[in-house]
Design a protein with these regions (language model features):
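Rossmann-fold cofactor-recognition segment
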Residues: 45-58
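NAD(P)-binding Rossmann-fold cofactor-contacting core
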Residues: 24-41
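Rossmann-like dinucleotide-binding core of oxidoreductases
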Residues: 114-157
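Conserved N-terminal Rossmann-fold NAD(P)-binding element of oxidoreductases
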Residues: 4-9
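ADP-ribose/adenylate-binding Rossmann-like module
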Residues: 84-102
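Hydrophobic/small residue at the entry helix of a nucleotide-binding pocket
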Residues: 12-15
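N-terminal Rossmann-like NAD(P) cofactor-binding module of classical short-chain dehydrogenase/reductase
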Residues: 67-72, 92-94
Length: 157
């Protein structure tokens, strides 16, 4: 697998970062402060999971075609990141709603055979995704025939 670059380590990022850090071979976490990036992967003892201080110019010197960039930055930054992903032939994912600036990239994204995924935010995206992971983990610990009922409040169970 190519390198995955996760930008931003806010509270809603931590479950995703931790899951990827355990399961991926090539992960770099970028954050405004290096300390927060390091804390987000402090439980992982893998030399191929790195933490770096976010710098827009630096990250796009390190990406390679086919890499995946996940942006958890504020929505106003996503068009800038998406355009740079297109320029560097990287796949892009964000939690933000599809806006006109990102939508305008669609033709070029398709022509370059890239994947840009948006609107995978808390509801329904990440919240539902981590709900499935929670149930999957529970089933590993118990019988697969159990019934799981719970309520989710934006990631809080």
């Amino acid at each position: 697998m190519k390198q995955v670059h996760w930008i931003g380590t806010g509270l809603s990022s931590l479950p995703g970062i931790r899951r990827l850090a355990v399961n991926l071979e090539n992960l770099t976490i970028w954050n405004r402060t290096l300390e927060k990036a390091e804390n987000s992967i402090s439980h992982v003892n893998k030399s191929n999971v790195k933490a770096k201080q976010f710098d827009i110019d630096l990250i796009f010197k390190e990406v390679n075609p086919g890499d995946i960039v996940i942006s958890q930055l504020p929505a106003t930054r996503h068009p800038e990141i998406a355009k740079l992903c297109l320029k560097h032939k990287c796949h892009f994912a964000s939690t933000s709603y599809l806006n006109p600036e990102i939508f305008a990239l669609d033709k070029d994204v398709k022509q370059q055979d890239l994947v840009f995924i948006n609107e995978i935010g808390l509801d329904p995206g990440i919240d539902h995704f981590f709900s499935h992971l929670l149930v999957q983990d529970l089933k590993k610990l118990t019988s697969n025939n159990i019934e799981v009922i719970y309520e989710s409040y934006c990631g809080g169970f």
